[in-house]
């Protein structure tokens, strides 16, 4: 079957934003204007098409990125048809993992910002993630109809807080209740959308007299930004003082693709104004798969390799999301980077070293689906029937193996015990948690060996609340939940601490003998660059001359690695430690792998105790927005929680307080902040770093442990 849309007319992009910037409403309008959805769904009444998990509809926040395919021929229907693959991403801090996943497979992004709230803490997190993957992006300043809307202020914040070279493509006509439309700086015309047709029709008119000067200045800034793309454009601009519409778009597109500028559009998705012109911007300014560099990976021989975005290249794809679907079972969402795939084909998963057959291929539209026979370079689709694929795995042709970059997922910072309410829930709970962990790599499940309890870990209280909620709804498992526990870590401060341990047992017949001398040190920045660092631990074998035979060295490392999962202070994982094996001895008959494993484990425990062991606690970056009246109480409370204030900013709803606060002090903070501010203050937090816990905290944790 031939390709229906040339790859140059594909746009794979994500809609990203802070919670409450109006992202889901914006996505809904996109689906409406691209003809997919005939009734506009409103988040306010829990009917949005993109938010298809029950909880999202209740909470009014987007949790799972749903992939949707749509088509666009321009606001005035004059463009050739473009194919949009849109991924809606969550804006809540506990779900940054979802954002990270979708950014990995997108070519571009539209940042939705609130015209009142501006750049908020999550915006910074998502922006940093987009920088990590060099994702070209544009901004859409939404909610221009709301009280306190200020387009210029948001553009300034983009520059000041995110370091973006923001280039407005439009100027708003009015604001708040008086928001009417926009001035298109390319055409230097005013655009008004027709309310009766829900914004599907529009008209151009002359720019209102009071905005002519503002629009002229803004246009000059835009044209200058375009001219800086190349010497030819700059020469023409300097000689003639202007550029044609085509040249401006060419220059701006080049610079957007290089992530040098961020074009800015504005509107009100809720009032059906502005989204249509922003979609034209997606076509003009965001990349097609062919504009992005070939995807990089490594071949079977661990050598670097690439795949170009063409149908003739060998097939390669990345699985970026696994979902359990009530009708078809497990769905694997994947992005095709190169080649073609037909339903029924076999693919190879180099991460698991397994072949799998792709059953059906589904083109997803939010929660509707259409079965298709094949996918090609640039497509995003979902496969049914893949059993052993996890998020971040590569799928490729068996005869041309490539492993694309693995996604790196953060370690969970919070844990809690869960137990089934009834015996019949026991088995179902194990299956439910297994499924949920397969879908979400930032969620972990383990059994505590001592207590036999099931421990779940994740990125925040809301994250775990939603997991427990999903167990109830999707798997009918009722569970009791323990109190949240902080994920502490253990490390050492002293360097070059020697530890010598001999494991020798003689009791008739074959004895046991293993003797090791190790040196413990904290890892340096240089150490961290080593390829041998795994789980934040480095093992170095310094044995020469066969003092310990080669075949026992892996047992020494294994003994060490097994010991660091439960540290000597309070049973938390050990991090940031380097262990050198420097000396030892063996016995021809009595030495065994087990003996060396035990010797290494005991040597580590004894050495760790002598190396100034310390407990580390997770520190959260917290941003609180509070009306001025409650500022004193809020800041006093931050200090009581051992918080360190990082600074203050102004915001339309009061003051923004930035602080670093230990996670152990943040449980139940949402409730206490609400009562302190009569429900008017809000906060968000994300994990920032680990640091040494004060002695009183360490003692309390150790006693508990």
Swiss-Prot record:
InterPro entries: EFG_II (IPR041095), EFG_III (IPR009022), EFG_III/V (IPR035647), EFG_IV (IPR047872), EFG_V (IPR035649), EFG_V-like (IPR000640), EFTu-like_2 (IPR004161), G_TR_CS (IPR031157). Residues 290-309 are annotated as: Disordered. Keywords: Cytoplasm, Elongation factor, GTP-binding, Nucleotide-binding, Protein biosynthesis. GO terms for molecular function: GTP binding; GTPase activity; guanosine tetraphosphate binding; translation elongation factor activity. One of its GO terms (cellular component) is cytoplasm. Residues 8-290 form the tr-type G domain. One of its GO terms (biological process) is ribosome disassembly. PROSITE patterns: G_TR_1, G_TR_2. SUPFAM superfamilies: EF-G C-terminal domain-like, P-loop containing nucleoside triphosphate hydrolases, Ribosomal protein S5 domain 2-like, Translation proteins. It is found in: Cytoplasm. GTP binds at residues 17-24, 88-92, 142-145. CDD domains: EF-G, EFG_III, EFG_mtEFG1_IV, EFG_mtEFG_C, EFG_mtEFG_II. The keyword Membrane does not apply. Belongs to the TRAFAC class translation factor GTPase superfamily. Classic translation factor GTPase family. EF-G/EF-2 subfamily. PANTHER family: RIBOSOME-RELEASING FACTOR 2, MITOCHONDRIAL, TRANSLATION ELONGATION FACTOR G-RELATED. This is Elongation factor G. It comes from Xanthomonas oryzae pv. oryzae (strain KACC10331 / KXO85). The lineage of its organism: Bacteria, Pseudomonadati, Pseudomonadota, Gammaproteobacteria, Lysobacterales. The gene is fusA.
